[in-house]
Amino acid sequence: MYQLLFELLQVALGNSEHLSRKFTVSQWNQAYIQAKEQVGAVCFGAIEKLSPEERPPSDLLMQWIALAESQRQYYQHYKKVLASLASFYRQYGVKMLLLKGYGLSLDYPVPELRPAGDIDIYLIPESGPICYDGIVKEYADQAVECCWGIEIGREYKKHSHFLIDGVVVENHDTFIDTDKHKSNLRFQSYLENLLVEKTNSNDNKLNENFLLESPVPNCYLPSATWNALFLLRHAGEHFATEKITLRHVLDLGIFFQSHSSEIDWDFVLQVYEKENMIDFYNAISTICTRFLWMNGGYFYGAIDREDLANKVLRDIFTEYKPLPMSNEALSKMSIIHYGVVKSLRWWKNRWKYKMVYNENILESFWGLAVNRLNN
């Protein structure tokens, strides 16, 4: 059912040169629908490599060309907004750490074909100690409000958000959502500790080996070890609470393929084990090796788990009715309905929760149910 989609991704990643056979018009249409939202432009990168005989019918090919061109144009616009934002923060003595997004695209065979979404950032002072108290974030948000006249949304604890030229920016106070999961408090501390080193006065000084320069001035990327923790946890949170897409899998696979030799694997695997994420890691690595034909050597310590990989893939291709991120602006009865529906969905998908969080499942279920009614 998904053979053509995966063969296109294999070609796009350089793991294959040709399709295995000639596919029907119906199969091409199905692959386009499957790919369109998250990996459509990436698949077009494969189509460009194929011989004319292997390509889709001309009418569908034109749709694919339009999709890829739209993505290329947005990517260039996205980069301009990113550069403008980084330059603005530099004037205020603030370094911009980029989470996900553009940094991951740099490892793709054709960076501009990776779908660009929000700009997720974490701000760090150029000098002085790093304090996890939100002061730098709020200082920067007020500067954006004052100088650019842009309204800042502050309703979420995890990050503020604002819109620049059609691009959503999320300015993070924490790297992951520490409000809903106890284990995320531990995970947040792993990420914070990698960012800093203690001084003689017990202040948190920036670990200079942590920040990696990007092609955009004052826009920094995190270390490979940090990303190995953050990216899997970030994808895992999407997976456990709702679902992930093939783009999440591609991001992880391409990241490990590009940076495996830079990762402190002893530390990373220790955290995966402690936080109960090994099964999720094994599932992702198996999808990458079995279905995308990536080299298993990049996924250090991973075990082939075809059973889990197939289960995760079935979930990826299952359509879920979207629910709002919060119950804000819902009526009282709608809030109750929202909480019940979301809790029932979570309970049905508790097998996913067990692959990501090291928590008591009944205690967490009750806590999340109450949280959904209140938020």
Report the location of each language-model feature.
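Conserved NTP-donor binding/palm subdomain of two-metal-ion nucleotidyltransferases/polymerases, i.e.
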Residues: 1-117, 123-375
